[in-house]
C-alpha cells in the first residue's frame, strides 16, 4: 500500500498538542483591525482547539500528525 499524502495547506494551519488534540489559529485577525477593540484583537491572537466534529476531517488531511 502506498504512503498517504499530506494536504500541505492543512499541515501549515494545524499543530498537535501533547495529548493529541489539534490546535488552530482564529480567523478575522489579518486586516480591517482598526475598528476592533484591543480586547477582541487580543482574544483573536490566541490559539484554540479544533472542534471534535471537525477533528476527523483534519486528521484525514494530515495522516502523520
Swiss-Prot record:
One Pfam family from the record: Ribosomal_L35p
Example GO molecular function: structural constituent of ribosome
Annotated keywords: Ribonucleoprotein, Ribosomal protein
UniProt cross-references to PANTHER family, sorted A to Z: 54S RIBOSOMAL PROTEIN BL35M, LARGE RIBOSOMAL SUBUNIT PROTEIN BL35M
Keyword Ribonucleoprotein: yes
SUPFAM superfamilies (alphabetical): L35p-like
Gene Ontology terms: biological process: translation
GO CC annotation, single: cytosolic large ribosomal subunit
Family as reported in the entry's similarity comment: Belongs to the bacterial ribosomal protein bL35 family.
Gene from which this protein is expressed: rpmI
Record-annotated membrane-spanning stretches: none
Protein name as annotated: Large ribosomal subunit protein bL35
Region (Disordered): 1-28
Amino acid at each position: 500500500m502506498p504512503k498517504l499524502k499530506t494536504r500541505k495547506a492543512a499541515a501549515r494551519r494545524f499543530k498537535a498538542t501533547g495529548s493529541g488534540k489539534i490546535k488552530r489559529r482564529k480567523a478575522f485577525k489579518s486586516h480591517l483591525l482598526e475598528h476592533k477593540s484591543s480586547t477582541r484583537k487580543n482574544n483573536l491572537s490566541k490559539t484554540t482547539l479544533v472542534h471534535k466534529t471537525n477533528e476527523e476531517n483534519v486528521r484525514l488531511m494530515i495522516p502523520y500528525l
